[in-house]
Amino acid sequence: MEVERAKGSRFRDPGVRLWHFATEILVRCPRCDGRALVAVHPDHRDGHTYAVGWLTAPHRLTCPGCAHVAEWGPRRWQSGAGDAYFTRGGPLVVPELGGPDDPYFGLPLWLRRPCCGRVLWAYNVPHLELLEAYVAAAQRERPTPAGSQTLLERLPAWMKAAGNRAEVLAAIRELRDGERP
């Protein structure tokens, strides 16, 4: 995803949602503690119109370090199980996005670190780059039409606070630099 930056230190919110970054999630491997990837299963057919279709699709965890592979499949929804996605085969539980663990296997995200007394996290490098561009900007433009559902509009106040900018940017850069080979 290309982050659009206007002249100077102005940032224009591209209007993406968190689920845009949930197709490839970097996690800690449960076997070797190395970097692993959680992604939509390669055998899964394309054709979903809505994000919830991708969120409830089968996912696979793969670790290039130790060759560990694990499969995740959607669970049938039952009362009290959270949000449901209704399909021809019956309702499915929609994985809950957000937080420093992946929504499928519950593994710690690879891109996470303490920051400002909280935990800074990102699903992948493009997610981290979007956060960096937003936090670094002196001026931030909302998308049109403005809504409250974009990833950036829903960031916690501590990440948006000007007083935390230097610490948040340092943490983001540390995470990003740790990703370089």
Indicate residue ranges for each PLM-predicted region.
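Eukaryotic non-globular, compositionally biased segments
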Residues: 109, 143-145, 179
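Short, intrinsically disordered, mixed-charge
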Residues: 68, 136-137, 177
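Charge/polar-rich, low-complexity and marginally structured segments
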Residues: 125-134, 145, 149-162
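Conserved aromatic-histidine-acidic binding/catalytic patches
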Residues: 17-20, 51-54, 116-119, 123, ...
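Well-ordered, non-transmembrane segments within structured domains
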Residues: 29, 139, 151-152
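C-terminal, charged low-complexity interaction regions
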Residues: 151-181
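N-terminal cysteine/histidine-rich coordination modules
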Residues: 1-87
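Extended interfacial segments that mediate partner engagement and assembly in macromolecular machines
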Residues: 75-141
